[in-house]
UniProtKB/Swiss-Prot annotation:
Organism name: Bacillus mycoides (strain KBAB4) (Bacillus weihenstephanensis)
KW Repressor (keyword) present: yes
Domain of life of the native organism: Bacteria
Keywords: Repressor, Stress response, Transcription, Transcription regulation
Full protein name: Heat-inducible transcription repressor HrcA
Hydrolase keyword on record: no
Length: 338
């Protein structure tokens, strides 16, 4: 169990190193207003913290830096919530204030804004479309031969595609089809739509649509949509601006992993509910052993729909990042309920 004095010194070392990226020595600590101990006492306490594994010496300096154990203790026991600036809160809330909530568009913009606000790499795993339920479908004619099919799900996903309208299918047929589809399919999971259409809906359509065969072929193409999650990145190259990653050999494997977007699917897909912080070698990939990954899930009720994560150095602004993720996931969850 650390003493109050050791807790204060450890917290000050971590806070200072996060801000400066420079090893922290006893002289630096002695100049801090909150540190009222003598330099000799500070050195003794730092020696004890080093022996306990919370801080470590670097090769190039007499100062100390937090170890992974030190960061973990800091995150678990010493972290204080950080109030975000009003202009950032307004910027984030404005993103989610759109009357029509398009989850994929918001996910993409969220990744970009988070990367700009943190100067780290932001990753957003969008909702898995197969678990979405159909809210409504629209078919909007552009001319006699083409139309735009718009599929909207309960999570705000909007999928649109241009389809060819067979000559034998007239506008009244289109209108009847849309009415039947919305009446019979609203609330059905996207993964079940194709099967339901061709086992049940076709029978209903046969009684209302004149050119039944042509209409069914058009429907088949309309509902062929990708069902897996989409992943969005913001600030892929931001890690290069961090002092600890100026060594290209050190950062190469990390950048390769970031470029291989599929690698993050497994990392983010099965995250536990709430805020999760993985520090250094707690991460499953060796390419991330000098990084911290903070992730948060967003959901509707008890149904977890996606994940928002920030990848940065272990010398990360943990409190600020957690506050940002809490605000984003809260806004995302509220938006999905619209």
């Amino acid at each position: 169990m650390l003493t109050e004095r050791q807790l204060l010194i450890l917290q000050t070392i971590v806070d200072d190193f996060i801000g400066s990226a420079q090893p922290v020595g006893s002289r630096t600590l002695a100049k801090k207003d909150e540190i009222t101990f003598s330099p000799a006492t500070i050195r003794n306490e730092m020696a004890d913290l080093e022996e306990l594994g919370f801080i470590e010496k670097t090769h190039s300096s007499s100062g100390r830096v937090p170890s992974e154990k030190g960061y973990r203790f800091y995150v678990d026991h010493l972290l204080a919530p950080q109030n975000l600036p009003t202009d950032e809160i307004v910027q984030i809330k404005d993103l989610f204030a759109e009357r029509i909530f398009e989850a994929e568009k918001i996910a993409q913009q969220s990744a970009q804004i988070l990367s700009e606000l943190t100067n780290y790499t932001a990753i957003v795993l969008g909702p898995k479309l197969s678990t979405n339920k159909l809210k409504n479908v629209q078919i909007v004619p552009l001319d006699r031969q083409t139309a735009v099919a718009i599929i909207v799900t309960d999570t705000g996903h909007v999928q649109s595609k241009t389809i060819t309208v067979p000559e034998s299918v007239d506008l009244s047929d289109l209108e009847k089809m849309v009415n039947i589809l919305n009446e019979k399919l609203s609330g059905i999971p996207m993964a079940e739509l194709h099967n339901k259409i061709f086992k049940e809906i076709v029978t209903v359509l046969r009684g209302y649509v004149h050119n039944y065969d042509s209409a069914i072929k058009m429907l088949d193409g309309t509902f062929q949509v990708p069902l897996s999650e989409k992943i969005y990145f913001g600030g892929k190259a931001n890690m290069l601006s961090q002092p600890e990653f100026h060594d290209i050999h050190k950062v190469r494997s990390l950048l390769t992993m970031i470029d291989n977007e599929a690698a993050f699917y497994d990392i983010l897909r099965h995250k536990q509910v709430g805020i999760q912080v993985k520090i250094g070698r707690e991460n499953s990939s060796t390419a991330m052993e000098d990084c911290s990954l903070i992730s948060a899930t967003y959901s509707i009720g008890e149904e977890q729909l996606g994940t928002i994560a920030i990848l940065g150095p272990t010398r990360m602004q943990y409190s600020r990042v957690i506050s940002l993720l809490q605000l984003f996931t809260r806004q995302f969850t509220d938006g999905l309920k619209k």
